[in-house]
């Protein structure tokens, strides 16, 4: 008799998941991709009544739980996802893992190194997963396709990764916790976490040293604990260079929340990703890849509808079969660790 594949097993078993923490809009995209990948959303909870009501409008058929414990005690649920207040995410994840479930959390996953260390202990004790939705790669077709091209050697050996993640602030729409350092962690540990994960992924590095990190509040004195600019320089364990810059200065005139780009330099060429838009307006939509190599003119690839978001199906399969094909736990947590180290470096050198 032919043995079933992991993918077939995943379809047969169909993973049920719940939500704990609805404090950031990212949770809706996370749920959408998990459902599209075959997951079944069965329940949701947030301690804030308004957040629960908003979620119920978007998912009217999903049960709104009366408490966090109701979800943790539900033996039919094997995965919990969430986007709680950033400083609360690790503690929720610890409770989730101790209840025998895997945890899939919005970035940034931590605000302190002590949270990271405690999570590592609980992972070792429980054998559960603490996975992070680094959406600037995992929900970007240009990024996922670029990863394939790099593995094919399109630009030779990767020498440097440069990532830029500007964001639109839209301050009136932000909750109060968003501007409190203890709760959001700082601009590097928040939105720059995407860049650290991509540095590791695109370069193949497994560790790095923080050379320099800086944060500033250039233009928002009304929010004294807020940081509207951050930059970091890294050197990978194998010598690869990394530079990343994030800010909250996307102007209202831009047709996107941010002109997110990355440049990857190799021995035989370079690659540029324009993730959200082509600012020239010449190419509609997002997910643009430009590759320039020795002896060949610049090649343009529109990655839209080319690859989808393959992480999510692979992650569901990993949860069911206890594998690590979507992303290793070591990679996930190393990105978080470097992010926190850089934030700490910047905080100490203000």
Residue ranges and their predicted role:
Residues 2-3, 9-59:
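N-terminal Rossmann-like dinucleotide-binding module
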Residues 9, 87, 110-171:
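A contiguous active-site-proximal alpha/beta segment in oxidoreductase catalytic domains
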Residues 133-136, 152-173, 187-195, 208-219, ...:
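NAD(P)-dependent dehydrogenases' Rossmann-like dinucleotide-binding region
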Residues 197-280, 311-322:
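Contiguous beta-strand/loop segments that form the cofactor/metal-binding neighborhood of enzyme cores
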Residues 3, 19, 79-81, 237, ...:
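C-terminal helix-rich "cap/oligomerization" subdomain common to oxidoreductases
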Residues 133-141, 172-208, 224-228, 331-332:
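Mid-domain beta-loop-alpha active-site segment that forms a flexible
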Residues 27, 59-122:
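Beta-loop-alpha module in the N-terminal Rossmann-like domain of NAD(P)-dependent dehydrogenases
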Residues 105-106, 130-132, 273:
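Hydrophobic residues in well-ordered beta-strands that form the structural core
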């Amino acid at each position: 008799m032919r043995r079933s594949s992991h993918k077939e097993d995943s379809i047969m078993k169909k993973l049920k998941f719940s939500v704990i923490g609805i404090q950031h809009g990212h949770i809706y995209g996370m749920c959408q991709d998990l459902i599209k990948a075959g997951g079944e959303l069965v329940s949701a909870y947030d301690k804030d009544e308004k957040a629960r009501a908003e979620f119920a409008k978007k998912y009217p058929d999903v049960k709104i739980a009366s408490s966090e414990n109701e979800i943790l005690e539900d033996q039919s649920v094997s995965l919990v996802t969430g986007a709680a207040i950033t400083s609360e995410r690790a503690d929720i994840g610890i409770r989730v893992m101790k209840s025998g479930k895997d945890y899939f959390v919005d970035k940034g996953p931590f605000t302190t190194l002590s949270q990271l260390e405690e999570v590592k202990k609980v992972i070792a004790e429980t054998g559960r997963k603490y996975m992070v939705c680094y959406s600037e790669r995992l929900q970007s077709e240009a990024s996922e396709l670029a990863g394939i091209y790099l593995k094919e050697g399109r630009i030779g050996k990767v020498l440097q990764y440069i990532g830029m993640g500007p964001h639109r602030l839209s301050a009136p729409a932000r909750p109060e916790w968003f501007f409190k350092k203890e709760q959001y962690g700082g601009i590097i540990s928040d939105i720059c976490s995407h860049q650290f994960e991509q540095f590791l992924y695109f370069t193949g590095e497994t560790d790095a040293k923080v050379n320099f990190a800086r944060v500033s509040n250039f233009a928002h004195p009304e929010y004294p604990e807020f940081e509207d600019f951050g930059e970091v320089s890294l050197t990978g364990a194998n010598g690869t260079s990394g530079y990343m810059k994030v800010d909250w200065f996307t102007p209202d005139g831009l047709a996107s929340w941010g002109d997110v780009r990355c440049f990857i330099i190799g021995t035989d060429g370079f690659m540029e990703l324009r993730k959200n838009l082509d600012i020239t307006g010449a190419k509609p939509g997002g997910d643009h890849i430009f590759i320039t190599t020795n002896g060949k003119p610049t090649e343009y690839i529109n990655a839209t509808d080319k690859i989808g978001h393959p992480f999510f199906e692979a992650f569901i399969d990993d949860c069911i079969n206890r594998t690590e094909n979507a992303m290793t736990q070591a990679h996930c947590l190393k990105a978080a660790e470097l992010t926190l180290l850089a934030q700490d470096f910047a905080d100490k050198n203000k």
